[in-house]
Amino acid sequence: MAGLGKPYTGHPGDAFEGLVQRIRLIVPSTLRGGDGEAGPYSPSSLPSRCAFQFHGHDGSDESFPIEYVLRLMNDWAEVPCNPYLRIQNTGVSVLFQGFFHRPHNAPGGAITPERTNVILGSTETTGLSLGDLDTIKGRLGLDARPMMASMWISCFVRMPRVQLAFRFMGPEDAGRTRRILCRAAEQAITRRRRTRRSREAYGAEAGLGVAGTGFRARGDGFGPLPLLTQGPSRPWHQALRGLKHLRIGPPALVLAAGLVLGAAIWWVVGAGARL
């Protein structure tokens, strides 16, 4: 079972100490913490022995977040591992010990979907790995998504016996948790679609910019001239438009046409005077 931790570039000892401190923050403060195996460990160099340990005194009633702790260890590691928690009745207290791998001759298989309660006599030991926990959760058909069912250990220390109850506990409001997960998924999909639309719009604008450059290169960058008026055109406006489109011929033809037009005007004026 491979871990999902991120590379750590600082001092290896600081990385491992940070993991232990995070575990201490989520474990009940009534459990006394102890030191595990000393050494310069990192996500790629895991301890081969006990990584952390906690003690519960006689008469205490504790709840240990076993699944959260094991998954925290698995996510921190960068190499394959199968975190394991061992619980022992020492005769005077209960001892919780965490390992990145199941120790040799460590008990296993005591916790099953049918058997979730264990009574430890003096010096007796039990334990559970993350792989076995996932198997139990799958056989029970529980929701494996984050923030849903998570295993806890209810520990009752009454010497010379220690009673353990392994229970899956979910959120106080499962419907609200599902809505939060659905809303988070919808927001992620919306962000993905918005990013896709932005990229498509940017590509379309870039294409229009290239086409516009070619249009200006042909000398038509200013486009068609706007109309001078929005209302009906007047006669003299139409005459001006006609003059704009009038084509002038050769100079000799223009001179001959002028002479003919002048003679016609002179003849009309003379004829009118005689009448």
Curated annotation (Swiss-Prot):
The keyword Phosphoprotein applies. It is found in: Host nucleus inner membrane. One of its GO terms (cellular component) is membrane. Phosphorylated by viral kinase US3. Residues 1-251 are perinuclear space. One of its GO terms (biological process) is viral budding from nuclear membrane. The chain crosses the membrane at residues 252-272. It is a single-pass membrane protein. InterPro entries: Herpesvirus_viron_egress-type. The keyword Phosphoprotein applies. Residues 137-181 are annotated as: Interaction with NEC1. Keywords: Host membrane, Host nucleus, Late protein, Membrane, Phosphoprotein, Transmembrane, Transmembrane helix. Residues 273-275 are nuclear. Belongs to the herpesviridae NEC2 protein family. Plays an essential role in virion nuclear egress, the first step of virion release from infected cell. Within the host nucleus, NEC1 interacts with the newly formed capsid through the vertexes and directs it to the inner nuclear membrane by associating with NEC2. Induces the budding of the capsid at the inner nuclear membrane as well as its envelopment into the perinuclear space. Forms a heterohexameric complex with NEC1. Interacts with glycoprotein D; this interaction recruits glycoprotein D and glycoprotein M to the inner nuclear membrane. This is Nuclear egress protein 2. It comes from Human herpesvirus 1 (strain 17).
